């Protein structure tokens, strides 16, 4: 064998071997236990980045480990290929999104294969292919027929210059990311999925996801946002109009002194029309339409509003309340109307203080009298009702129910439940997406495309190079069609395309039978493989993608296509890959290769000025703190990159990039290679020792025990815990112990014990460094791949130590340690402890009150 490990010589060879042998291809096998592992599929941007490498390295370790444990492992890969990034890149590069996307898929696929990831490429999917989105359209039609889809007018981000709708992500400081012009709110007809019909079920099952991170479950619950409260009707003064308000605090109703409507609330325009406030209200509403809603309603944002020129009546007190439109009220929460109780809600308190509005205390803490004049903040804790008429003296928690019941009995309101979640608007006025399969007929109205005419194929002869709006409405060859119901030849196709979250909501099921051409998927295949046993991806998808996937699975369940409700049994959200930023005072952000020197003396290669090192943060193209996986691959090989990504940090934490760490991983592989080479001749023809540790003594016994202890440690660290860093550390310790074997220590069992240790090292790191270990395994003369070799098992009788470390304390404080034989007699160990020099020093000659011995753990001398 070569003296040094050279990844260039071996990685391509083993990738070709795996491919030729079809080792990653799987099919349903009822005789084997299945394991379905997925990482979130990527958008085909053109090149993989280190975030991809880390994500897929984590998944590949688990996939290879489970295969070696005997599971039938499905580990697929595909492409989230529709969406605005491809469309925008195509416009920028004067090409077509389809060409751009498929070229990127080919390039990134080659990069992933070069990393040695064990994907079943026969199951590759791309969501932009008609054979994929055909079935998405089919399901849309079924949902439409069942009333699960509807169309209504809704507010969207609109860029007048580009004549297009923008997703929230495309709005930066309320400016269009493309042209820089202001974005406004515009009402357009949009298609919606009735996800709110499933809100309770989605929420209830959040507590039935034990394999999910608690923070993700909490985020899902908060997004669904179930609130118990009351719906209260406020009559508008001198009008028949009633304003419906949802509140979780009906106990504070008597303290409501004004009302706030969201700027988007339809009554703002209606009630201000013809009043002296009309122009002021219009200006305020227009200004609010240009503000980001999340920032507008943030706790630290100054509260502001204007009266709309109308008043309403408090149904309990009969008092007149001024109606305002305010920046902190949102149409998306409750009813878009807020009964404002300044003494018991902090936002209302700040608003009332700013505009000099009345404050009435209606909840007092027991034994204390609050006064509006002296309050510096709202009182939001429990207490007793005051200034609340017949409800005075009640605990506020009891008054919630009593007031809600009173409102119900007097037709002023009712108890109800509200949700933060809203129906899912899936319309996108963009080109590069799955066409919505609906037809608009002048006579019949809206009708679905017949199933035998699916898919509605996205035309590729559209011109995207002029402006930014979708070309579909102007493309007669696409738009003009015949009504399938009445034959009217003036019918038009729907020109909106679907939100790309729709494609990613059912792709796990499609992986089970990606070539199925008579349905969304083969039902029996899905029954075998689903649900996904382990899903891996970024926490940035903790809400939308995962929630939509859970919703879609319930829809499929309702149609009888699947027999489960939750698509993902276990979820791992890996941390980001981070690196320090480097900035030149003259040239701005710099790539790492544009900096020379070290420490505080680093300089810009362009101008020689001292470079400012910023904080360590997520790798991003905008700040140039990126590392190109291809450059690393050429320098170190795939296995070193994989090993570093797995060793540098636990998977759920952020990984701080370190070139020294990569070098360290490379040195470790060289060290293992040298270890193998040094003992190759001795162990090549030996059989691994498999006997009892009692048949060994001295260092050989210790090495044999260490081998089995390491097998147990690595197995448990990988299986479920995903503690890859500590698993690798354990293997490093075993390697060190092999290096510590004295050449002069001979014996008939030496070669067998050494062979067992070396084999364990190879097998245990094989999921992390597959090419490297396949090469070493083959040098042993093995004809079967490592991946086809059973995962090693440990011997229970080899796990116990012959010696233990016993902690010595004086008055409960650690003072020394002893290495003693396991299960040493209590009297003997007490004698050894009292004779220890450090223990005697800290006893200071004081009389001993007692000596506590915990066998094999500690001795505490109390003086």
Curated annotation (Swiss-Prot):
CDD domains: Anticodon_Ia_Leu_BEm (cd07958), LeuRS_core (cd00812). InterPro entries: aa-tRNA-synth_I_CS, aa-tRNA-synth_Ia, Leu-tRNA-ligase, Leu_tRNA-synth_edit, M/V/L/I-tRNA-synth_anticd-bd, Rossmann-like_a/b/a_fold, tRNAsynth_Ia_anticodon-bd, Val/Leu/Ile-tRNA-synth_edit. Its EC number is 6.1.1.4. It is found in: Cytoplasm. NCBIfam families: leuS_bact (TIGR00396). GO terms for molecular function: aminoacyl-tRNA deacylase activity; ATP binding; leucine-tRNA ligase activity. This is Leucine--tRNA ligase. ATP binds at residue 621. The keyword Electron transport does not apply. Coiled coil: none annotated. A motif ('KMSKS' region) lies at residues 618-622. A motif ('HIGH' region) lies at residues 42-52. The lineage of its organism: Bacteria, Pseudomonadati, Thermodesulfobacteriota, Desulfobacteria, Desulfobacterales. Keywords: Aminoacyl-tRNA synthetase, ATP-binding, Cytoplasm, Ligase, Nucleotide-binding, Protein biosynthesis. Belongs to the class-I aminoacyl-tRNA synthetase family. It holds the Pfam family Anticodon_1. It catalyses: tRNA(Leu) + L-leucine + ATP = L-leucyl-tRNA(Leu) + AMP + diphosphate. The gene is leuS. GO terms for biological process: leucyl-tRNA aminoacylation. Its main location: cytoplasm. One of its GO terms (cellular component) is cytosol.
